[in-house]
């Protein structure tokens, strides 16, 4: 069955023609054309619908391509930027600066370790000489009898009561290095205090310091001097 809106052209063409046979032929022609149109009316929308359906698909593909391009650009921006010559020069300069800082730190640390080692363990350090002289005082019978045990030693005392390092003085005599030290001792005897005087001289053969003299002055009454060692 043809739709109603297609029957009106057929009737109009039939009335316009004079001969029934001619009108019949025209009617058949019109009917065949209308049948073709009828088929095309149902086919055309299908093709048009397919065409319309294809356009969104093609548009969707285009949008997908744009999205892919955007993703690729985004991945490029997120990744490592291309390094040019100036950027490489800046990085090399920065690495060289870090290397210099590390070398300076290592040098300062090595210097500190050297100073500490010389101060504590070297035979020519004042701390080492002070320790050896204090042990001689602790083992001397007269010192033990005068001050009592245990005997402890300390350096100069500040106004705030803090005890500093042992005072010492280095000098050269007849081309030989010498050193004089002074520290204080006290024991279990109340109000008993003594001052220890030391002089050492470097042995040219061994390079070590040797004691020239060690003596203790008792600062309280009765005052006297205890000679522990005298090699002059």
UniProtKB/Swiss-Prot annotation:
Annotated Gene3D superfamilies: Mitochondrial import inner membrane translocase subunit Tim21
Main location class: mitochondrion
Cross-referenced InterPro entries: Tim21, Tim21_IMS_sf
GO cellular component, one term: TIM23 mitochondrial import inner membrane translocase complex
Pfam families documented for this protein: TIM21 (PF08294)
Subcellular localization(s) per the UniProt record: Mitochondrion membrane
TM segment ranges: 96-116
Family stated for the protein in its record: Belongs to the TIM21 family.
Known function: May participate in the translocation of transit peptide-containing proteins across the mitochondrial inner membrane.
Name by which UniProt lists this protein: Mitochondrial import inner membrane translocase subunit Tim21
Name of the gene: timm21
């Amino acid at each position: 069955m043809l739709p109603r809106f297609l029957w009106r052209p057929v009737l109009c063409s039939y009335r316009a023609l004079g001969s029934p046979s001619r009108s019949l032929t025209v009617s058949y022609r019109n009917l065949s054309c209308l049948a073709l149109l009828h088929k095309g009316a149902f086919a055309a929308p299908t093709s048009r619908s397919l065409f319309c359906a294809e356009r969104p698909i093609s548009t969707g593909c285009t949008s997908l391509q744009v999205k892919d391009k955007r993703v690729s650009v985004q991945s490029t921006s997120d990744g490592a930027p291309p390094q040019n010559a100036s950027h490489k020069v800046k990085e090399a300069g920065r690495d060289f600066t870090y290397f210099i800082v590390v070398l300076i730190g290592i040098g300062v640390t090595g210097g500190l370790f050297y100073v500490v080692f010389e101060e504590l363990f070297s035979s020519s350090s004042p701390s080492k000489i002070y320790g050896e002289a204090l042990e001689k005082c602790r083992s001397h019978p007269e010192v033990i009898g005068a001050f009592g045990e245990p005997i402890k030693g300390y350096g100069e005392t500040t106004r705030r009561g803090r005890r500093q390092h042992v005072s010492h003085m280095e000098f050269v005599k007849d081309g030989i290095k010498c050193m004089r030290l002074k520290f204080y001792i006290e024991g279990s005897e109340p109000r008993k205090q003594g001052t220890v005087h030391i002089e050492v001289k470097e042995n040219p053969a061994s390079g070590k310091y040797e004691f020239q003299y060690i003596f203790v002055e008792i600062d309280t009454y009765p005052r006297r001097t205890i000679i522990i060692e005298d090699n002059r």
